[in-house]
């Protein structure tokens, strides 16, 4: 090994001798003491925990994809080196010497840069910055650099030539095959990747091409199997501006200035006289000759480019990127055609070629019968959902199968919006016709009309009404499978076909070998120019193979070499050439060592990438639908025009499109066959075929175990040991002597370690160990399976959680998932809130969606992921808040709550209903006169009877206790039902998905609506109403203070903290105008009066709770007395007068601070003295003493303190335009804000409530409610669950977790670990 001083070149020294002497002087200098002392001293162990042993860390390194690729590259390079060392091409052989020279020069340059930068300390930095990361010393650095150069050069040679040829038996590759010869499926077997000039028995440099061609062939196999590439022959007819004007198709008074687009898709009519090959005339010619475009010999389909508005030709659609590259409607339409050839397609309308409409406008093919007798009969027979019809389609056995056709009924969707005109009105029907059950109001944005399940086909406009479809399968005749797809897209109408699909796609599946041969046939055609001029296309097959290969080139190349080595069917590949014996032997040697591990990694990589690709289907289709949903949300549904749903059905539970997933299932099933004789595709417990999303998860889990087992076996076989660290080194280095090339193998292991030890996976393993070592936390959750113990917690001692059950802890899990769900851009990809089959155990409601979200995270298989650490950090924070009799939760609240500002437990949701305009309550009836008394009475009695029957209308049902299954189109439109999965009815205005957060309340003591009026309660009781079970309350926001109210709608926040008492409420006088009396018969009569003494129906709650935060008058006075500055006084004074609207009198701001305080105290004494006496009213005794007849009492006399009598009392109830207690919901008026209506329920809390939290707070008994903020246990835990999401609480909890670890901080012995993770988690040995 040369030292650095010998690297200086003599010419350089002679021309710059002064500089050279300086360098020598620096080289001889010793590093500074401070630099050396600051170095990390490596240990013999990575960390002082069991899972951080040498064997364990090496195994994890070889399981990690990136680390394994680092290792694999160093194992691959020595194999490829043998190809260079004995090569008969001198240029290739000399490349090795060039690589070595280039590496030596690169090292000299790098060394010089470090000298110039760090002077006397450069040797330290050479070791720590360079060598420590690349194997430990100069030799390892150079070996790595040369190895990488070998790999890069070899790969560049693989794809340098196009080797596809027609190989005639007994002749070899033809110079140029004929068109007729290759266009025959029986000759496809002769199309191969083979060099034209090779001689197996001679040692020639041209024989290198045999190596490149053979590897190309194996990489092509990978590409075909893993990407499922299909050529699509296609033409497009782009959207047109109609010559007769858009106003002959769309009502331009409703849709102003329509332009050519998908929504306003128009095509000019066929004109026999005009000629031409574009537009309608071109479609006429194309459709008339469609049967002739399929070549019965080659099975290829070539559509003349002249018909296309663009250049036409063919496109290669691949699994990994087609939904990123193309319009998702186009990609999905291709899959529909792919599946149709396998007899697996569903949902689309079907036409025979001869029935295509050719002599009118192209788009008329997409207007289909909407209400024919056949469709109605099919619906009745199949009990199909609205928006679908059942058609008979032929099957192989001569029988018939039912196929649901999804179509869009625009007549019903647009309701009274007159969207269409002229031609389209004639076809589609009159959208503003007076229909039975049809049509929402124009201002309603197309709300559902009689059905919330989808776009119904049932209208009363007669058989002339047409529905719209987006895709049509086109087949030659009734007995054949569809060869073509006619589909609508953003740019126009596409006619497409899977080129050659009928050759390799059958009912039994995809024949990968035939698919490969067909694509080679097309590649051969383009190579030799054997394509007809009118159907030319651009197809560079091996550019696509190279593009795929580059995504994981080390693993894919290694897998290709192993496949060649084990390919017993091909005796003529390069491995049998005498001149490549050394190369072949090296492949064989490494095959035994690495095959199991490489193939396990290979499958895992493909399964992962395919799962990612399939997820894009759901995401991209959701993005496709989103603009149309937004139009509906924004009351601009007419802007959707002709937009129609696609024919694919989304699984409401999982969010996946299972039918489209069959395309991806063809990939993983074929990959799984590698190395096995059979492939399992059915569920072991049901015997039913699994869909893709289920199967890929199963395969990933099973194969992950194979990767782990193979890595463990491989590490054990290598007998790896640590070696002394070089001078100045800060890392642990390893070595093995048991391998084909021990130097490169040892280097590979060190590179794998270098990558893994700085990875997030390693950091998370350290963090995970803290959770695993916390004994109290382990009693709550099984960290391996992430499941809760049935009895989670101790006895309430130091670490106990008062025996919370697993069900209690699920509240925390669901809260975490709801928070995560809210952050998702496309929430519909996780399914939606719907009803399950009555015989199914599937969860309904938001819980089902959260289950899908949780399953998608696959946490149990990713314990070293950020997702798991985030989840465990949250759960530990909840545990930390609960432990020690909720000491930390109590302290957290005490730091947030203040005596001088109110705090609330808040439930707030939005409503699409303006309840304020349509009240049928006592409060609205009370102002009427006696002349309308009978009408008023009937209205009240009817309302009471509805409530007694549990049938209260939207305006009278507590929407905070109503599950909103689709707030503001989160899961799509129920009118369109874009996903054909019965999207729940939309609650339009509720666009804040926090409405999904809910709590379980205690059992209620009265009926569903819990009316505030005596008569309504009496009627409910007379109707046999019984005590109801606990109901959920939605829109839970936890404890909200003025400083944490940002998550609330602005209007709600302002009402709570700036307008708790508003001007309108201040003007309300106590009293009413009517009284309702019930006789024993149950009949009601109306009695007028001046004042009623029934406080429950007429109490003015304006100031109730205004000063609840202070707790009592004494506390308020003490705070006033304790004020030290004018600023403090002004803050309190402004809070009372501005925020709470209290008319404070007698305070002169021009006087001294002491005088102002005295005046304010006097005002408190004068006005609030009754507060403590009126804080609790005897509601229960009043109700029990009340007779069936409400008696008229004298008007109460006003007194100056009446408004303030409950000022220190707790307010629990609804707050909006007015404030009413919980029992008085029917008189509640929503808070309006910009066209939205907020329903908000609150419970006040103060520091006195917080002080009571402690020993008995987590007991189930209601007697403990006053020790948990007057909440049920479920509500209380939900409040704590939200507090556990607080980043500040999480920081404190994790600090406690770390400081409380009995083993102390994790000791680490490698600088790479120490520097990659926060110092709070680790320390040096």
From Swiss-Prot:
Q: Cross-referenced InterPro entries, in alphabetical order? A: DUF3713
Protein's UniProt keywords contain rRNA-binding: no
What keywords tag this UniProt record? Cell membrane, Lipoprotein, Membrane, Palmitate, Signal
S-diacylglycerol cysteine: lipidated positions: 28
Which domain of life, per UniProt? Bacteria
Q: Where in the cell is it found?
A: Cell membrane
Could you tell me which residues belong to the region Disordered? 379-402, 430-464
PROSITE patterns in UniProt: PROKAR_LIPOPROTEIN
Q: Where is the composition biased (Gly residues)?
A: 436-448
- Residues carrying lipid (N-palmitoyl cysteine): 28
Membrane-topology descriptor: Lipid-anchor
Q: Which residue stretches does the UniProt record annotate as biased composition, category Low complexity?
A: 449-464
Please provide, in alphabetical order, the Gene Ontology terms of the cellular component aspect for this entry.
Answer: plasma membrane
**Which N-terminal stretch is annotated as signal sequence?**
1-27
Ribonucleoprotein is among the record's keywords = no
Q: Which family does it belong to?
A: Belongs to the MG307/MG309/MG338 family.
Kindly provide the name given to this protein in its UniProt entry: Uncharacterized lipoprotein MG309 homolog
